[in-house]
Amino acid sequence: MKKYVFVLQGVIFLLLTACSGLKYSFVGVDIPPDAKTVSVKSFQNNASLVNLKLSNQITTALKDKFQSQTKLNIIEARGDLQFEGEITNYSVSATAVGVDKAAMNRLTITLRVSFVNKLDETKNYEQSFSRYADYDSSKTLAQVEDELVSQICEALIDDIFSKAVGNW
């Protein structure tokens, strides 16, 4: 019995020792232990075709992602982790051509993102992220736009989040 208690104490000691001083990581997230805040500046819409709700939708979605997936506090400016960016492309193009017309159309959204990690500058990046969704050309963009934009935004936010704090 004493041997069992001794082994159990040893295992607990090793676990506590191993966990101290490490970055916390869950759901594949790797954030410096001293990071307490994140700030997200409003994404500017510089695309030639403008969706009036898109800037706010992207900015809010990125904040929501950090709020739901981390313990960081969202602040207006100068966070330990900082994001800013712009919408550089919002376009529709034909992807599959049928007899005399396009059979499928593609909505593409491209973002240019700048990320600053004040606690670990090796994680800083400036990068473009682009995602698309296809839809049947028998429908207008107005009929499918809200759903497609939501799908594309979710994928873009996942990409941005993973690039900044992903532990892959």
Model-derived regions, located:
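A broad detector of the eukaryotic-type serine/threonine protein kinase catalytic domain
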Residues: I12, F43-S48, V92, D134
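Short, glycine-/polar-rich solvent-exposed loops and beta-turns at beta-strand/coil boundaries
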Residues: I31-P32, I75-L81
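Second-shell loop/turn segments in exported
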Residues: Q44-N51, K139-E147
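A structural "domain/chain start" motif
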Residues: L16-T60, D64, K71, S162-W168
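Sec-dependent bacterial lipoprotein signal peptides
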Residues: M1-C19
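Compositionally biased, intrinsically disordered linkers/stalks adjacent to structured regions
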Residues: D146-W168
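Surface-exposed short loop/turn segments
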Residues: S68-L72, D80-N124, S128, Y132-D146, ...
